[in-house]
Amino acid sequence: MSRRYFGTDGIRGRANGLITPELAMKVGQAAGLVFQRGEHRHRVVIGKDTRLSGYMIEYALVAGFTSVGMDVLLLGPMPTPAVAMLTKSMRADLGVMISASHNLFEDNGIKMFGPRGFKLSDEVEKKIEKLLDENLDKKLAQSRNLGRARRIDGVHDRYIEFAKRTLPRELSLEGLRVVVDCAHGAAYKVVPEALWELGADVVPIGVEPDGLNINKECGSTAPEALCRKVREMRGDIGIALDGDADRVIIVDERGHVVDGDQLLAVIAESWKEDGRLTKPGIVATVMSNLGLERFLKDRDLSLVRTPVGDRYVLEQMLKQGYNLGGEQSGHIILSDYATTGDGFVSALQVLAVVQKLGRPVSQVCHKFEPLPQILKNFRYRNGKPLDRAEVKSAITAGEKRLNGHGRLLVRSSGTEPVIRVMGEGDDRILVEEVVDTIVSALGNPAVA
């Protein structure tokens, strides 16, 4: 069965394009029916980021869930990992996050978590998809069995305490000037407050959401503003989150960016020294730099690679017993603490290493020299460009040229009509030639 609605991270698209009130209500009904298990009163928790369309989608979901007899607990703007944590903590049958993550405000999405706080499996998503294409009128609850909805107070404090408990009680961030960019998104209240409670001198930016400015020239996908602010304020470290705070990028005191691969190296080395790794290795995706793999190998640690998407990273972590994994983009999963990527908790682990070593972030967080890596995106309108003969031929030729000297990865995005062409190797000129040849075969200029 093909997937019409769900991508690699829930349902995502243009607000009032794909993501309409009608679809959101139907998603609430379908998911509510799938998760009505047992005879108890069923409940769902719903959080959101700060997009203007979040109001529309939130109320449509409420209508859908209550119409099939599920009670709804509304959390308001909260990080995605907080929604996952609260789903389990509040004994809910289902958790929902309204967000398009790092996308701009025009887009929105619906991602869901099961009762244990994990993202839904492909199998469960297919069950929901099947119901989305059916007439559900005869499956609605009787009038006396409709669900109720109410807003929950104090959820910010719950997440702050959860995040703080991931650090040793005796560890303080006193003496650190931390510049944090919340991308005008879901973390704009909780993260600056939590850092202040831990003793840091906090300089917050990206904390003035207006519904339209989420991720706009800020956050983990546009860290330039944070780099400038760190240098301007003489910060010790910068933390950039994305709109729903499930990914993080670090900036050192010189204003240089530290990506997810480097953060995985920092945490992996520290956890190995402390005996905290459950297995001698970590899980990352096919996008992670070969430099990370070599760094880990030198320390007798393995790197298990998965397809792109934090859900696939977590799947392998659970299957093989690893407790650390993540993506170059900044999705870091620490399964000792969380069931999904948590940008803030990951940043806290890095801050703990910085405090423990007492050295500048530039010395702590640049663990290896990354191999030259070229990534270009080709946006298309329709069709299947990767099925064309000339594209297949260009990919095969590129793989032969890089054989033994690097890697080539060509894949379709799971969330937008984009083909990503990534090459890496010791010879930057060769890598760029290979990538450009494939992009040319795809037919249009690429967007770097």
Swiss-Prot record:
Annotated cofactor note: Binds 1 Mg(2+) ion per subunit.
GO cellular component, one term: cytosol
Signal peptide: none
Recorded catalytic activity of this chain's protein: alpha-D-glucosamine 1-phosphate = D-glucosamine 6-phosphate
Pfam families the record matches: PGM_PMM_I, PGM_PMM_II, PGM_PMM_III, PGM_PMM_IV
Residues carrying Phosphoserine: 101
Binding positions (Mg(2+)): 101, 242, 244, 246
Entry EC number(s): 5.4.2.10
Posttranslational mods: Activated by phosphorylation.
Alphabetical UniProt keywords: Isomerase, Magnesium, Metal-binding, Phosphoprotein
A GO biological process held by the record: UDP-N-acetylglucosamine biosynthetic process
Cofactor: Mg(2+)
Record-level Gene Ontology MF annotations: magnesium ion binding; phosphoglucosamine mutase activity; phosphomannomutase activity
CDD domains: GlmM
Active site, UniProt feature: 101
Family: Belongs to the phosphohexose mutase family.
Role, per record: Catalyzes the conversion of glucosamine-6-phosphate to glucosamine-1-phosphate.
Protein name in UniProt: Phosphoglucosamine mutase
